[in-house]
């Protein structure tokens, strides 16, 4: 089906961060857009305000006539939707063209030059930073992001003239195999989603296959030292990057007074005195990767410097909520042991003499089962850990798999406790908080406004 001739697009799972970018894209193209999501959220309410017809009850009766013609309606679904879903079954049994979100994204990106950021972690910030660099420059871009840009308040950026499309390339369910990147960054290959892949070897092979999809004439920029054996087509250049090593890296890093500056080193030309708009050490490496993509896309040095300094970050990615002399509070989406470790180390670099407390909500029973010792090792870098129950997302409980697996493997001597998420405000009210971070990809973020209110009263 030619997406340009569509009249209507129906989304099953419309409120997901990746799906919502496509909802906004088709609304911008004048299509009739509707769909289902399991629960209302701030994001679904915004989509409704923007023109989407979204409902929250699983019922074929709520599918309006605008979405009942198979000849003019495309159905898009997220892999988290079960085959037994009533609306999914209706569309499947009535001859509709049905595609995963990643397939539709692939259709849209084949025509342009895809700047794709893949990796177990770091891809949302790096892709959003890249999109900001291009969007504020003479080059411009379209961008489908996996988080809400704080510069623009959206996860979709559009351009009528740019051939570049910035994409967060998601490895879940092998979704990134539908893409056709022109240039790709791979930030990390730490095993994850073993409920899908089964083994570390299968996970790494999926990344290897992804590298084979990069178009001839393009490039792969890999974080130096990660476990990866690329399978590049002829004519694809290979580069490395990291914070302090690789073809692209940073030198003369200066951290102090709440600011970070560094000199950017590149085979395409060095740029001195880069200032990070979100001054946390983890963003030095993210910034190096984003600047490499920007340089390869034709941005000037001045455009890159201006864009790096004006980048405001991504919602729930090292997202400072309170930052004053009494208390610091931030929310972070980190949900894999490696990214949790990086987040904590970044906080340590900023607040060396402060007590660091985290509330962690594990995400998925399978991930907790597979990595509970690694989670405990990362969280043991904190002074205090408060664990809440596992957020199940798409999964059913697994006997014996609870947050206590992590709790029992934390280092001796660390302050630790467990509670229901509904009890978190009461628990925090009894503590002397200096620096607090909420960690996790579940619904712990729903408590952030109340936590802010509590801490501001102290």
From Swiss-Prot:
Give the UniProt keywords, A-Z.
ATP-binding, Cell cycle, Cell division, Cell shape, Cell wall biogenesis/degradation, Cytoplasm, Ligase, Nucleotide-binding, Peptidoglycan synthesis
Listed under catalytic activity are: UDP-N-acetyl-alpha-D-muramate + L-alanine + ATP = UDP-N-acetyl-alpha-D-muramoyl-L-alanine + ADP + phosphate + H(+)
Write down the SUPFAM superfamilies for this protein, in alphabetical order. MurCD N-terminal domain, MurD-like peptide ligases, catalytic domain, MurD-like peptide ligases, peptide-binding domain
Quote one Gene Ontology molecular function term.
UDP-N-acetylmuramate-L-alanine ligase activity
Q: Which GO terms describe its biological process?
A: cell division; cell wall organization; peptidoglycan biosynthetic process; regulation of cell shape
Give me the residues that bind ATP, please. Answer: 119-125
Enumerate the subcellular locations listed in this protein's record, separating them with semicolons: Cytoplasm
User: What pathway does the UniProt record associate with this protein?
Assistant: Cell wall biogenesis; peptidoglycan biosynthesis
Looking up Pfam families in the UniProt record yields: Mur_ligase, Mur_ligase_C, Mur_ligase_M
Q: What is its EC number?
A: 6.3.2.8
Annotated GO CC locations? cytoplasm
The record's section on InterPro entries has:
Mur-like_cat_sf, Mur_ligase_C, Mur_ligase_C_dom_sf, Mur_ligase_cen, Mur_ligase_N, MurCDEF_pg_biosynth, UDP-N-AcMur_Ala_ligase_MurC
Q: Which NCBIfam families does this entry report, sorted A to Z?
A: murC (TIGR01082)
Q: What does this protein do?
A: Cell wall formation.
Please report which protein family the annotation says this sequence is part of.
Answer: Belongs to the MurCDEF family.
Would you tell me the protein name for this molecule?
UDP-N-acetylmuramate--L-alanine ligase
Please report the organism this UniProt entry assigns to the protein: Phocaeicola vulgatus (strain ATCC 8482 / DSM 1447 / JCM 5826 / CCUG 4940 / NBRC 14291 / NCTC 11154)
């Amino acid at each position: 089906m030619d997406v340009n001739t569509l009249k209507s697009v129906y989304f099953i799972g419309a409120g997901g961060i990746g799906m919502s970018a496509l909802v906004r894209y088709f609304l911008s193209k004048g299509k009739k857009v509707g769909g289902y999501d399991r629960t209302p959220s701030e994001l679904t309410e915004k989509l409704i305000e923007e023109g989407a017809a979204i409902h929250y009850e699983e019922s074929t009766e709520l599918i309006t006539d605008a979405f009942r013609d198979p000849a003019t309606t495309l159905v898009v679904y997220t892999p988290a939707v079960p085959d037994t879903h009533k609306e999914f079954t209706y569309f499947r049994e009535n001859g509709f063209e049905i595609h995963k979100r990643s397939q539709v994204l692939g259709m849209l990106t084949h025509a342009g030059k895809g700047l794709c950021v893949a990796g177990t972690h770091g891809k949302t910030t790096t892709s959003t930073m890249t999109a900001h660099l291009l969007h504020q420059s003479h080059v411009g871009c379209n961008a489908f992001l996996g988080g809400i840009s704080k510069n623009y308040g959206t996860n979709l950026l559009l351009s009528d003239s740019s051939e570049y499309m910035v994409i967060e390339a998601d490895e879940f369910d092998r979704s990134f195999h539908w893409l056709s990147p022109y240039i790709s960054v791979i930030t990390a290959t730490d095993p994850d989603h073993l409920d899908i892949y089964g083994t570390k070897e299968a996970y790494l092979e999926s990344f290897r296959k992804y590298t084979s999809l990069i178009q001839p004439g393009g490039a792969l920029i890999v974080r130096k030292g990660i476990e990866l054996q690329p399978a590049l087509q002829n004519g694809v250049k290979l580069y490395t990057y990291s914070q302090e090593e690789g073809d692209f890296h940073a030198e003369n890093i200066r951290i102090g007074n709440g600011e970070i500056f560094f000199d950017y080193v590149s085979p395409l030309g060095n740029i001195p005195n880069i200032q990070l708009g979100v001054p946390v050490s983890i963003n030095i490496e993210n910034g190096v990767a984003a600047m490499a993509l920007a340089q390869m896309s034709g941005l000037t040095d001045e455009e890159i410097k201006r864009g790096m300094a004006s980048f405001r970050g991504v919602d729930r990615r090292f997202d400072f909520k309170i930052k004053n002399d009494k208390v610091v509070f931030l929310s972070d989406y980190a949900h894999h042991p490696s990214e949790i470790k990086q987040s904590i180390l970044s906080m340590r670099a900023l607040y060396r003499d402060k007590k660091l407390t985290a509330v962690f909500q594990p995400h998925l029973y399978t991930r907790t089962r597979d990595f509970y010792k690694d989670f405990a090792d990362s969280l043991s870098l904190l002074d205090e850990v408060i664990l809440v129950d596992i957020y199940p997302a798409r999964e059913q409980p697994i006997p014996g798999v609870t947050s206590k697996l992590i709790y029992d493997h934390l280092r001796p001597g660390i302050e630790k406790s467990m509670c229901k998420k509904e009890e978190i405000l009461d628990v925090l009210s009894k503590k002397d908080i200096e620096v607090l971070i909420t960690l996790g990809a579940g619904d712990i973020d729903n408590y952030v406004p109340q936590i802010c209110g509590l801490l501001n009263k102290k």
